[in-house]
């Protein structure tokens, strides 16, 4: 919110997960009063579903959104149909079978846990405390 985007950008690109959720994304759009598009951050159908919900909650949406990136994944835990270039705002329910099939290996799970520990010990705990965030 601290950046003055006037005369710096023409269109605000909103990505739900990196911005902290739908409510925060909506608040940013309202604050900056710029035309917006919603794009994904190469997420599963669950994340894409949140992007679709954000797009559906915006008062105006004059540009095409970038929410079809799920097609870049070899597999996904749910399907979001695209009909005539459009996606419906709807609940996204992951397939239990797909989640079992796509479950990360023990080695990959350990890799991610180690990565989070390294980030935390590199100062994330201090930043969270300084920002007043709750973990």
Residue ranges of model-derived segments:
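Flexible C-terminal active-site loop/helix
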Residues: 41-135
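Catalytic core of soluble alpha/beta enzymes
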Residues: 1-50, 55, 74-82
């Amino acid at each position: 919110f601290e950046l003055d985007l006037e005369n710096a950008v023409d269109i605000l690109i909103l990505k739900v997960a990196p911005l902290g959720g739908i409510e925060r994304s909506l608040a940013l759009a309202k604050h900056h009063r710029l035309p917006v598009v919603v794009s994904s951050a190469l997420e599963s159908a669950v994340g894409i579903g949140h992007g679709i919900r954000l797009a559906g909650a915006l008062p105006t949406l004059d540009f095409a959104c970038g929410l079809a990136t799920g097609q870049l994944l070899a597999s996904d835990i749910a399907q979001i149909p695209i009909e005539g270039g459009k996606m419906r705002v709807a609940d996204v329910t992951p397939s239990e079978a797909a989640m079992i099939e796509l479950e990360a290996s023990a080695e990959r799970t350990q890799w991610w846990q180690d990565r989070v520990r390294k980030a935390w010990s590199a100062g994330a705990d201090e930043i969270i405390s300084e920002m007043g965030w709750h973990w």
